[in-house]
Amino acid sequence: MAESLRMVGYRSVALTIPTAILNECSRTLKECFAQVGLETVSRIDLTCSNRYELLKLLRRFRNQYDVVSVKCTNQNVAAIACRDRRVDVVFFDPNNRKMKFTHTLARLLNGALELNLSFLLDRESSDALNKAMRQMDVAREHRVKVVLSSGCTSPKMVRSPMQLRAIGVTLGLSEAQSAEAVSSVPSSIIESNLERRSPLYIEEGVRLVGRSELK
C-alpha cells in the first residue's frame, strides 16, 4: 500500500487508526510508510448517534489525533460537527438518503466537507453519484472547503492526485477548487493541527515565543 501511494505521487497520507491500537501500532505504521518516503498523520473517524456522544468523544480524542472527522448520521450530529472548531472534516454516507449536506449546514461549517471516492466507485447505483454532485453544488455555492480522498483500503483502490482532481471536476468543482481539494486544503488542516498540538500553542492566534524568536 505504502509503495503504491508513493508511486502515484503522494508525499503524505492520513492513516485512520482505531483508538484501541493507537499507541500500540501507530509508530509501526508510521515507520512502514517512512521507509518509502511518505509522511503520515493520524486520523479518527467519529460516528455518533447524538450530540452528547459527539461532544464526549471530541473532548476525549481531539488532542490524540492529527485529524478528526465526523460522519454525519443525523441532523443534530451534523449541526454540532459543522459548528465545532475541533472537527476538521465532516462526511456523509451516500447510502443514508435522509442525510444531506444542506445550505444551512454549509453556512455553519467551520471545517471541510470530505468526499470519499471509495463510496462512489463501490456503488453500481447512480444514487451515490447524484448525491455527491449535489453536495459539490452546495459546497461551490457557499465556498466551502472540500477534501477529496480516495478512502483506499488496498493497493487496487489507490487513485493518484491527478485522478482525484479529474473526478472532482466531473462532480462539479472548478479546476482550482478540485486542485485545492487534494493539496492545499488537506495540507492546511494538518499544519494547523500540528501547530495546535505544539507545546508553544496557547489558543487560536496566541503562542509562546522564545527569546531567540524575539531577536
Regions found by a protein language model. Give the residues of each.
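Active-site mouth loops of central-metabolism enzymes
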Residues: 1, 45-47, 67-71
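Charged catalytic cores and adjacent phosphate/nucleic-acid-binding surfaces used
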Residues: 1-16, 22-36, 52-63, 76-215
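Glycine-rich phosphate-binding "P-loop"
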Residues: 37-47
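Short beta-strand/loop segments at the ligand-binding rim of alpha/beta enzyme cores
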Residues: 40-42, 62-68
